[in-house]
């Protein structure tokens, strides 16, 4: 029989480990505890952001449940960066970098302390992939607990969320919103704890993790402030102890087939473009053969059947009341769009977990549709290629009346310069804004362009202006926007060669992104291009810029270490 403390006994057994045990006695351990599995609780609690401000009660619930199930809990902290607070500033360069820092920090504690399992608890966007990357890397029994979504805010009879505040900025600058109402939206958009409420990045990733089998059923759409979130966390910890007993590990669950399940659900719920980047990183950590083209393969066969913000109507709390991710998965499973034989952290297969879920969503809800009445017949996250991005880039094509545009390039070498032009109302109908040198290496850190895209939407230009960047977009972004352009400008990608006024085409139907300049002229510009000096030469951002892979491979830091 497998010993449940197979790893932790490396630091607790034998005469030579007397000093190690002394450290444990100092924090309240008793001799009987050294035969128990030692389970980490990676706690993302923080008073920095509402996304993480409600996590301590979940971490406490996990500790209590672990101890009650015969394990010994070891809580440690993981960092977080608030995208909503850093957005539009230099601080946003640390957001994607924090994904790597979170993965590294969890790996450090789990392996450095020989833990036998780990409960990862996170809230804000990069907590999600960072934690899952660590689970895939370490491959010790683990489970992901999402901190839960925020509830909607309210102002003058309207439901609000954080994107309402970003879009209000553009409405105010264009004279469409009063200063009083701007303040009203600002003060009521986020009413309490929990992650941003639409199908933005955090809720996209939590939904995907449930579909992946690494989180409990229904857990991904619960509100942080509801009692069921604490109860689900308790259950998650108990389930993890059972997984330790069964030696059920992340890589038994995270397989190519389960990744296909997760991406299918991302398409069905209308999830964030960031999911493409993050699942490239997760599959890299799990050593699964997965490329950016696999997203396009799945997009073509999975329709969008959930009507969610930012381009739709509803929030995660509405989805939860309508049946949650299990209802979405059951619809897909019945049509052969999911692999029912994939294992989950519960010890049951996907098909077994969904056995009692109705095949048809409730008639009294409007959030989840049936496959014969989808919002869109194909998925929404399209991979475009062309001379601007031969490696591929990502666009979200839901909510658009016309998913193609050809127009003059308005070129900016940073988000800040582009934002200044937008706020000064210098961008007009038909323009294509190009924001470059914001990629993994050039930014560094691939800032999210929620501020400029929301300002454009607020000014009424969301349908008539295109935007191309080697940076990223928030899960709250919608419009004719294309991100993750690779190769990026900093390494000499074609996006670096676009001149002000050049004709550029974005065509989501043809999956095309093209600089309409002849090859000879592009070659001439390429020969004259010189790489700019790095923006940082010391510290974390400099390290990330040095190590980061191309966006088409997830912008990870451990991919090319042997090159």
Swiss-Prot record:
Active site: 474
Source organism, top-level taxon: Bacteria
Family, similarity comment: Belongs to the IlvD/Edd family.
Organism field: Polynucleobacter necessarius subsp. necessarius (strain STIR1)
Residues annotated as binding [2Fe-2S] cluster: 51, 124, 196
Pfam families in alphabetical order: ILV_EDD_C, ILVD_EDD_N
Role this protein plays: Functions in the biosynthesis of branched-chain amino acids. Catalyzes the dehydration of (2R,3R)-2,3-dihydroxy-3-methylpentanoate (2,3-dihydroxy-3-methylvalerate) into 2-oxo-3-methylpentanoate (2-oxo-3-methylvalerate) and of (2R)-2,3-dihydroxy-3-methylbutanoate (2,3-dihydroxyisovalerate) into 2-oxo-3-methylbutanoate (2-oxoisovalerate), the penultimate precursor to L-isoleucine and L-valine, respectively.
Annotated positions of the N6-carboxylysine modification: 126
EC number: 4.2.1.9
Matches recorded under PANTHER family: DIHYDROXY-ACID DEHYDRATASE DAD, DIHYDROXY-ACID DEHYDRATASE, MITOCHONDRIAL
Entry cofactors: [2Fe-2S] cluster; Mg(2+)
Keywords: 2Fe-2S, Amino-acid biosynthesis, Branched-chain amino acid biosynthesis, Iron, Iron-sulfur, Lyase, Magnesium, Metal-binding
GO terms, biological process: isoleucine biosynthetic process; L-valine biosynthetic process
Quaternary structure, from the entry: Homodimer.
Annotated Mg(2+) binding sites: 83, 125-126, 448
Cofactor descriptive note: Binds 1 [2Fe-2S] cluster per subunit. This cluster acts as a Lewis acid cofactor.
EC category: lyase
Catalytic activity as recorded in UniProt: (2R)-2,3-dihydroxy-3-methylbutanoate = 3-methyl-2-oxobutanoate + H2O; (2R,3R)-2,3-dihydroxy-3-methylpentanoate = (S)-3-methyl-2-oxopentanoate + H2O
GO molecular function, one term: 2 iron, 2 sulfur cluster binding
Full protein name: Dihydroxy-acid dehydratase
Pathway(s) it belongs to: Amino-acid biosynthesis; L-isoleucine biosynthesis; L-isoleucine from 2-oxobutanoate: step 3/4; Amino-acid biosynthesis; L-valine biosynthesis; L-valine from pyruvate: step 3/4
